[in-house]
Amino acid sequence: MRTSVLRQAGLCRAALAARHLQISSKPSAALLSQVTRAIAVQSLPSASLPRFYSAEATAQSNTAASNGLVTRFADLAALGVHENVVRAITHGMGYENMTEVQSMTISPALKGKDIVAQAKTGTGKTLGFLVPVIQKIITQDPDLAHRFGGKRARSDDIRAIIISPTRELAEQIGEEARKLVKGTGIIVQTAVGGTQKNAMLYKTRQQGCHILVGTPGRLNDLLSDSHSGIDAPRLSTLVLDEADRMLEVGFNEELRQIINYLPDRKVLPRQTLLYSATIPKDVVGLARSYIDKNNFEFVQTVKADEVLTHDRIPQYIVPCKGFENIYPAMLELIEKALNESRTNPEALPFKAIVFLPTTAEVIMANAIFKRLQWKFKHIPKTWDIHSKLTQNARTRAADEFKNARTGILFSSDVTARGMDFPNVSHVIQTHIPPNREQYIHRLGRTGRANKPGQGWLIVPDIELHAARSRLPGLPIKRNDELECASVNAADSGADKHANFQHILDAASRLPEDLFKDCYSSYLGGALQGIDRQALVYALNDLAKFGWGLEEPPAVRQSIMKHMGRVQGLRVETREHSMRPMGSGPGHRRDFNSRGPRRQSDDPFENALHRAQDLDRRPTRRQQASF
């Protein structure tokens, strides 16, 4: 199989003779360093290769790239890609020009090389790995190039597995893959948590499967179940998408177990394509386990002179008097943005993603603003996405928001990476993010395809110091223009902004358990770096002045033990049978190398250093100036 792909790639080498970045398969740390430097520094003309890729618009190219890289999808036929696949891209999906990551990865992947690619989300990575995956299957079984050709597909003869960190991203990849194989006999199935396993197995056994897209947990479950009927004895390609994210959320063990269920690559060679937005040490370790170090190419599309989204998009931080000021200030911001979109013809329609630190807070925010929408018709429709929803509900919400012209999506971090929501005008984050990287990934949901956007961070005063320490080196400006942010809600004589009463009215109709869940979720570690006693006092003020409760919600004994000796908590008289929702992720430390670097014989280590050279991350001692 592998030989046939290499032979096919060899037939088109004449068409690639002008390619300056041709890489020998001979392993050499020095050679890899030289090539990655060339890839990182040598910029392609912006007119030829658009920086961003999205489903709603594909940038047009007027001239061929000067360095000889294939930049048009129609030219894939010259590389041996089957005409049915090319037609699906150019006619079915309407794409003409490749993005940079597509141009730089498809060609070497078609030659059979393993790929380690550092590329940002929203740059067309999905199509970049789907094309070689599909073509390799067709090369292995030419009858599958046609819709009704070949033998009936089976569930125990999977040829490619694509692993994604989230259900939403896996579903998105599966949807794109089905568009690509529409004119072929290749069958695509998805396997994600939050859906009925038996229903997926029944469908897969009935239809068969050539490409299986899934999340690590569900894939490990299926492959480890000897009665599932899911197997991949002739697996030819393995794809790891958003590798850094999979490791961040703790899927390392599942990934290791999945590999144990796959054929030994020493007996049955397979191609591995690994994509990651960042290349920290744990990703390098992952690559070392999965990638053939004698036959791989490291592609880096993040350049030293590139203006990144978090450097380009205007960003503002709004310090608030207390937790109870956050929703009124957010409502004020939304109303101002709506007015701007109505009066400024050049402004995007208001379409916002609001990131909140816990699942319970996502549910509460959506419930409150949904009631505000019923009362004030100018407030756009709202949705929420979080881990407590079924996969069908999450997919429905994502699709509706994606297709909406205007709206507000309240979300936990399940949508922070990978999901492509077009024309998002605002990303609003409440409370301090778990780390600088997550702040940047959330912000990346706006400003896509070089469109305008804004980032807003709304934090109470007790989190301001932690925000300064956690978010250095970012162009975040302090904004004190929102009136609701500075109001002292505890002052009964104060002339409060009307938004405070609007929020109280909406909260008065919410169920008691929702307040208890939200209150407890903040005590579960969602806000690291905040003094526990100050946090309890702040939450009690929120309960009284923001939710209108006479006393704070009672908490379980286990939370009391976790909090230690703090004042102001009420304890439940008996253990509640239902656990609070969404305790939220804790702060994760970063393990960046320190001290002078030395040249290594390990090509993966050199790739790491080259990638980290472009990450202009400030030192830990620096603080933001807002």
From Swiss-Prot:
InterPro entries: DEAD/DEAH_box_helicase_dom, Helicase_ATP-bd, Helicase_C-like, P-loop_NTPase, RNA-helicase_DEAD-box_CS. It is an enzyme of class 3 (hydrolase). Residues 607-617 have a biased composition (Basic and acidic residues). Pfam families: DEAD (PF00270), Helicase_C (PF00271). It catalyses: ATP + H2O = ADP + phosphate + H(+). Keywords: ATP-binding, Chaperone, Helicase, Hydrolase, Mitochondrion, mRNA processing, mRNA splicing, Nucleotide-binding, RNA-binding. One of its GO terms (cellular component) is mitochondrial matrix. The keyword Nucleotide-binding applies. GO terms for molecular function: ATP binding; ATP hydrolysis activity; RNA binding; RNA helicase activity. It comes from the Eukaryota. ATP binds at A119, K120, T121, G122, T123, G124, K125, T126. The keyword RNA-binding applies. A motif (DEAD box) lies at residues 241-244. One of its GO terms (biological process) is RNA splicing. Residues 329-493 form the Helicase C-terminal domain. A motif (Q motif) lies at residues 74-103. Residues 106-297 form the Helicase ATP-binding domain. It is found in: Mitochondrion matrix. Residues 578-626 are annotated as: RNA-binding. Activated by exposed helices in a group I intron RNA. Residues 569-626 are annotated as: Disordered. Its EC number is 3.6.4.13. Acts as an RNA chaperone to resolve non-native structures formed during RNA folding to promote mitochondrial group I, but also group II, intron splicing. Functions predominantly by disrupting accessible RNA secondary structure and depends on spontaneous openings in tightly packed RNAs to gain access to RNA helices. The C-ter region (residues 578-626) is not directly involved in DNA unwinding activity but functions by tethering cyt-19 to structured RNAs, so that it can efficiently disrupt exposed, non-native structural elements, allowing them to refold. The Q motif is unique to and characteristic of the DEAD box family of RNA helicases and controls ATP binding and hydrolysis. Belongs to the DEAD box helicase family. This is ATP-dependent RNA helicase cyt-19, mitochondrial. The lineage of its organism: Eukaryota, Fungi, Dikarya, Ascomycota, Pezizomycotina.
